[in-house]
């Protein structure tokens, strides 16, 4: 592809001659960044680079005005350079040029929220950096679903105690911010900004207040009007995009803080969802992951609007979209129409994440999960009856207050019955503002650990058996990075990693360079409990 690369370089030079001069590669692609080798003396190159022909996102910024252009280099469809987002939304604020850094804890929704935060600040002239040392403003976007996750945040904040003269603005965002509020200032006095997920559009104003001399500022409103309004101007992945379609939760599980930290369920209009999907497709994104705490509870707020299954089909029909994923589903709202949609639309990925939490009906009732063991297994049977082979993953909590040995045995037997392709298992931890907090933490930590090991060991046996059944089969894989098993430099021939439609990780060897972002055929040669190993099939 050398000729195409040169043409791309010339086009960029011609269209942006005299503008400043900087491009940077998003942090997650720093190992596999394409060296553009811009020849003009007006350009300055930042960051590392490696093998030719890879898919990269490159950022250009100007001195005259702030428009930022994300430029996609795509050797599959030919080279092109186009703006993503308009200059009219890029006005410079008094904080223009201030550097910020975001560290994200938790799930995909938090990762997507961090993209929203970056979008808000980039649109006001701030500059995102990948090195915390280079940042004037440091944000920790937090998770509080489990005690360990929240403790990790405060541990990270504690590192600043050793450096009182760091000179940075420290901000706590997300669920811990919403849950703890101003108490964070008491636990970590060097924090100066606390902002919940419903107030991210206010971040430039909060930062301006700090600049004006205020010592501490908060954005902890519960107003949900802005939930879906934040424009994403910079995404962390150049071919896979997150898109939140429902925020909050109405299920009120006894152990869960989400209704408190995220508020009640509210769905985005299908018209707005489809408009953004079309924009993403036009910008070169081929895989969309629809997000929600209970994503399948989606209901279009418009009169006689789309159901979740209808929305899945509509998103998959957008020209340029090759894969559609969704997470996380709640069993109560999971119906036959979703399975039928997956069965009939190839672009809908054949994977469902359906958390069960326990195999015991008695514990499920105590958890307020609104279904029984048998009702849940009926959902699994529905999924397994599909014509396509749909993979199923789940979440399990051990050590819930009052859980007995018999309850644990029922969970282990449910693993056998469900034959999951993957399980995320956790020890119960009491969380503030939850019903289970009043039940006490009745299971000793050592016993929780023993029960967790039982679940993990049994599930490991199931996964290796299921993965071994796939040896010899060929799957389409979206290559999304260099494999941890690689023996050659990132971007060169050797080891790559990607995901199948069923969301299995597949490490693969290939004689070809430049596979990042490509859909390729891979034959499985070996299996492990958590991934597959295969060879690129030409």
Features from the language model and the residues they span:
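Terminal RNA-binding accessory module
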Residues: 69-71, 438-538
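Radical SAM/AdoMet-radical enzyme domain recognition
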Residues: 309, 314-318, 323, 335-394
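Intrinsically disordered, low-complexity polar regions and short flexible loop motifs
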Residues: 326
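Flexible glycine/acidic-rich beta-alpha junction loops that bind and position SAM and/or redox cofactors
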Residues: 181, 292-301, 334-337, 356-367, ...
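Proteins enriched for Cys/Gly/acidic motifs involved in redox and nucleic-acid/cofactor modification
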Residues: 57-298, 307, 337, 342, ...
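Short, solvent-exposed loop/turn segments at secondary-structure boundaries
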Residues: 149-151, 264-269, 299-305, 366-369, ...
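Short, low-complexity, charge-dense intrinsically disordered segments
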Residues: 3, 10-21, 27-39, 43-44, ...
């Amino acid at each position: 592809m050398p000729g195409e690369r040169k043409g791309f370089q010339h086009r960029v030079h011609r269209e942006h001659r005299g503008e400043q001069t900087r491009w940077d590669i998003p942090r997650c692609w720093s190992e596999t960044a394409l060296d553009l080798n811009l020849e003009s003396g007006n350009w300055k190159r930042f960051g590392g680079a490696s093998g030719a022909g890879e898919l990269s996102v490159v950022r250009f910024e100007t001195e005259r005005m702030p428009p930022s252009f994300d430029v996609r280099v795509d050797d599959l469809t030919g080279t092109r350079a186009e703006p993503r987002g308009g200059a009219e939304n890029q006005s410079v604020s008094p904080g223009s040029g201030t550097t910020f850094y975001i560290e994200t804890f938790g799930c995909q929704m938090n990762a997507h929220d961090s993209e929203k935060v970056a979008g808000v600040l980039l649109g006001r002239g701030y500059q995102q950096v990948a090195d915390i040392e280079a940042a004037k403003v440091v944000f920790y976007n937090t998770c509080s679903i489990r005690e360990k996750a929240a403790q990790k945040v405060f541990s990270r904040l504690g590192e600043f105690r050793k450096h009182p003269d760091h000179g940075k603005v420290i901000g706590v965002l997300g669920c811990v911010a919403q849950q703890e509020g101003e108490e964070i200032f008491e636990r970590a006095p060097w924090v100066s900004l606390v902002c919940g997920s419903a107030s991210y559009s206010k971040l430039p104003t909060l930062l301006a207040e700090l600049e004006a001399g205020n010592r501490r500022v908060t954005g902890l409103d519960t107003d949900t009007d802005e939930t879906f309004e934040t424009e994403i101007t910079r995404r962390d992945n150049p071919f896979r995009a997150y898109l939140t379609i429902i925020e909050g939760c109405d299920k009120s599980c006894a152990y869960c803080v989400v209704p408190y930290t995220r508020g009640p369920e509210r769905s985005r209009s299908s018209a707005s969802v489809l408009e953004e999907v079309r924009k993403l497709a036009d910008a070169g994104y081929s895989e969309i992951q629809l997000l929600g705490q209970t994503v399948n509870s989606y209901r279009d707020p418009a009169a006689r609007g789309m159901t979740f299954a209808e929305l899945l089909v509509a998103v998959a029909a957008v020209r340029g979209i090759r894969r559609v994923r969704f997470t996380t589903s709640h069993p109560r709202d999971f119906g036959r129409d979703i399975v039928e949609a997956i069965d009939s639309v190839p672009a809908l990925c054949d994977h469902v994440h359906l958390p069960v939490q326990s195999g015991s009906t008695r514990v499920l009732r105590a958890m307020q999960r609104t279904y029984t063991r048998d009702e849940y297994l009926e959902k699994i049977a529905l999924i397994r009856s599909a014509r396509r082979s749909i993979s199923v993953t789940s979440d399990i909590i051990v050590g819930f207050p009052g859980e007995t040995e018999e309850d644990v045995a029922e969970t282990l037997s449910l693993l056998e019955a469900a034959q999951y392709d993957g399980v995320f298992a956790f020890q119960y931890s009491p969380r503030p503002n939850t019903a289970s907090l009043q039940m006490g933490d009745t299971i000793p930590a050592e016993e929780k650990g023993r029960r967790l090991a039982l679940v993990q060991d049994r599930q490991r046996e199931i996964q290796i058996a299921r993965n071994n059944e796939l040896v010899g089969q060929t799957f389409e894989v979206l290559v999304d990075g260099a494999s941890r098993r690689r023996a050659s430099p990132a971007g060169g021939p050797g080891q790559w990693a990607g995901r199948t439609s069923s969301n299995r990780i597949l490490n693969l060897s290939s004689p070809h360079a430049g596979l990042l972002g490509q859909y390729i055929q891979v034959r499985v040669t070996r299996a492990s409990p958590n991934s597959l190993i295969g060879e690129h099939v030409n």
